[in-house]
Amino acid sequence: MTTDVIADMLTRIRNANQRYLKTVSVPSSKVKLEIARILKEEGFISDFTVEGDVKKTINIELKYQGKTRVIQGLKKISKPGLRVYAQANEIPQVLNGLGISIVSTSQGIMTGKKARLANAGGEVLAFIW
């Protein structure tokens, strides 16, 4: 049993991406579904589906451009031992706008750019580039 389910999801995606796998399965939760939705909206993954009745899993289809990975890196920022919070004007940019930050706000989980536009701060979950 893992204590940080978001880090587990990011690690599974990173490992599958390094092996050039087409799909990766992740145990489902509301937070993970929101992160997968953001990754699809931003073009980092092709698609995702939810399967199963009792134990639902999210099947994420990774995206490649020829032999090049679309996801170059993933980094978990806020950890169970050290939570990282940022106000709306302090949400960091990733690689000068080439990547995204995922932020958990009072209005839901969204990208750092949308959080800045909504003037909502929160917990910085991850960086993806």
Curated annotation (Swiss-Prot):
One Pfam family here: Ribosomal_S8
For whether the record's keyword set contains Ribonucleoprotein, the answer is yes
Q: What does this protein do?
A: One of the primary rRNA binding proteins, it binds directly to 16S rRNA central domain where it helps coordinate assembly of the platform of the 30S subunit.
Keywords of the record, alphabetical order, are: Ribonucleoprotein, Ribosomal protein, RNA-binding, rRNA-binding
UniProt record, GO biological process:
translation
State what protein this is by name. Small ribosomal subunit protein uS8
GO MF annotation, one: structural constituent of ribosome
